[in-house]
Structures are given as C-alpha cells and as structure tokens.
Amino acid sequence: MGCIMSQTDDAASRSKKIDRLLKEDQENANKTVKLLLLGAGESGKSTILKQMRIIHDVGYTKDERRVFRSVVFGNIILSLNAIIAAMEQLKIEYEKEEHRADARKVLAFGATGEEDEIPDELAALMKSVWSDEGIQKAVARSREYQLNDSAEYYLSQLDRICEADYIPTQDDVLRTRIKTTGIVETQFIFKDRLFVVFDVGGQRSERKKWIHCFEDVTALIFCVAMSEYDMVLMEDRKTNRMRESLKVFDSICNSKWFVETSIILFLNKKDLFEEKIKKSPLTYCFPEYTGHDNFDDGSAFIQKQFEIVNKRQGGQKEIYTQFTCATDTNNIRFVFDAVTDIVIRDNLRTCGLY
C-alpha cells in the first residue's frame, strides 16, 4: 500500500513540475517579440537594423567600427566611379580638362568594393574630381543611373575619411552599403522583452528565402524608400522602384502567412523625399497624382497607395504607418518606441491577455 501511495505522489509531483515548466515556457514565449524586417532592395532595412543595435544594444565598439573602414572606402570609390561613368552617359562636360584627366586616373585604379586603404595619390585625385561642377551636376541627376544614397555624404568628407588614422564614426557605419544576402538576426532587450529581428535580403533573387522566417512572427516591418519613386530597380533597370515596392507589399500584406500578424509600414528616407519632390514630380510614378509637389501632399498620397492594397480593412487588419529617416538615430528611437507599444499590445491581445 505504501509503495502505491509513493508512486502516486511521484506521478503527481512530476505532473506539477511539467505544468510549471510549460507555464514558464509560455511566459517566456509571450515575452519574446519576433520582428521580420522586409522591403525591396535599398529601402533602408539594414540601416534600421543598425540603428536598433545602436539604440538598444552597445552600438559599435571602436574595433568594430575600424572593420568598416574597408566598406566605407569601397562605397566611396564605387560611388565616384559610378558618377564618372554617368558623366559620359548623360553627356555632361567637366568644368576643367584637368578634372577629366584625373577622372580617368581614378577609374584606372579600379575597385573591388572593399578597399583596405585609399592611397594618397588616389585621395588627391578623388578630391580633384569631386570639386568639379560637372560632377556635381551628375550627382543632381542621380535618379538617371544607380548611385548609393550615401555617396554625397562620404565624398563631401574626403579630407576626414582619407586620413591615415581614420576610424568610421557611428554615422559613417550607418551609411555603409552592403547588400543583404540570406538572413541576418539581431537580438536585444527592450521594455522587459527579448526582441529578435530578422533582416531578409531585399533584391528579387533573395525573396524566395523569406518563407523560412514566417513562422511565429509577432510583427512585420515593411520598409519603403519614399525617395525612389522616380528610379528603376538595380536588377532590371526598367521596373520603377516604388511600383515594385507596392507589388511586394501587396503580396506580403495579403499573404496567408500574415493573417494574424501586425504590419508596420516604414515610409523611409523621408528627408530625401522632401528635397526630391521639389524638383522631380510625383507624377513620374503616379500619373494620376494631382496634389502639390511638397512633402505633406506627396507623403499622404504615397501612404494611401500602400494602405489601400490591404484586403482586410475595416478592423480585420490594420496597417500602422510611420514616416522615417533611417540615418537619424533620434527619429528611429522615437518611432521604434511607438511601434513597440503597438506590437506588445497586439501580441498580448493574440495571447488573450489584453
């Protein structure tokens, strides 16, 4: 009889332990927020991920920033090469013949995309070429060819960047351009929750890999480069970038994978958009647009174009839209704080705790 009682007590004890562990696992799961960061290529996703590391983690140490030297150098050289090539393509004349000769020498140096250093001779040539008025005209027409957003930022600071002891700043790191391939995962603690953020390659060739991130995602952040309404894709040089973003957002927003998932729309690069719309009309992408060529009218129109693709409107599925500047740490800090409250609230509602 005593043995039977002992076995019964052991079974009850094991059952309670299992129940407690299951409860703890559920509580931990409820405190984990998984964010999927999506968007077309060059929408600013990776920059936003870097901001999250700066804001919510330790940022980048001096040694880590030093590693980005080669990336900055590569971005600068490739950008200047693209501008020089565009001079001929756009039939823009150099202000001075000596600058044309220096441009040829810059091209002769070649570029791998990640240079270990910028030789003094190349630095002097680059500064000479960058000072040319014709080069500045080519930069102003960058929508007509492929040029990194960071090009002007870096090239205007060649004196600092070409110093022998140069170490990239946090801002320099934020503006580096490295194509995201595959899936990059970042984790940090914020508001007593573990955030796991997945950045997925944005170019067309990478999208087939997104499916592996879909399970159990708490929320989705979709990034759109507002300023690219008058530009074409790097992949095919024909498709309008804004139209491509709309197409991808439609497929994501209405996907069976995201029926219960909160969707946050980041209309990014608002600073570039505000300047560009003054000189490049929004009708380039949207012929039906009748508003003024200013930020307020243009941004409201773009927001509407994305929100109307939602086939689960009327309370079934809400899209939370934020206007962002991924290179502005204070802006991303403010926006992410607001977004986090939305995500936590929706997550609690899904768990039946709100």
Swiss-Prot record:
Listed GO CC annotations: cytoplasm; heterotrimeric G-protein complex
Keyword Lipoprotein (UniProt): yes
Q: For the region G5 motif, what residue ranges are annotated?
A: 324-329
What's the family?
A: Belongs to the G-alpha family.
- Sites of S-palmitoyl cysteine lipid linkage? 3
Binding sites annotated in the UniProt record for Mg(2+): 46, 180
State what this protein does: Guanine nucleotide-binding proteins (G proteins) are involved as modulators or transducers in various transmembrane signaling systems. In the 1-cell embryo, probably together with goa-1, controls nuclear rotation and spindle elongation during mitosis. During the first embryonic cell divisons, plays a role in gpr-1/2 cortical localization and in the proper orientation of EMS blastomere mitotic spindle.
Q: Where is this region: G3 motif?
A: 195-204
Protein name as catalogued: Guanine nucleotide-binding protein alpha-16 subunit
Keyword line: Cell cycle, Cell division, GTP-binding, Lipoprotein, Magnesium, Metal-binding, Mitosis, Myristate, Nucleotide-binding, Palmitate, Transducer
